[in-house]
Amino acid sequence: VGPHLDDYGGEALHRNFEVYPQTKTYFPHFDASAGSNQLK
């Protein structure tokens, strides 16, 4: 897990925004698409 922590964190945020779109209300400036630089 250690060496891939950044990858897993970005993926977790992406999944959170996909499953709970209302969460994006608090982060309107984020590009929540998969692989975006803001979620890495």
Curated annotation (Swiss-Prot):
Signal peptide: none annotated. Keywords: Heme, Iron, Metal-binding, Oxygen transport, Transport. GO terms for molecular function: heme binding; metal ion binding; oxygen binding; oxygen carrier activity. Red blood cells. Gene3D superfamilies: Globins (1.10.490.10). The keyword Glycoprotein does not apply. Residues 1-40 form the Globin domain. InterPro entries: Globin, Globin-like_sf, Globin/Proto. The keyword Ubl conjugation does not apply. It holds the Pfam family Globin. Belongs to the globin family. Involved in oxygen transport from the lung to the various peripheral tissues. Heterotetramer of two alpha chains and two beta chains. This is Hemoglobin subunit alpha-2. It comes from Saara hardwickii.
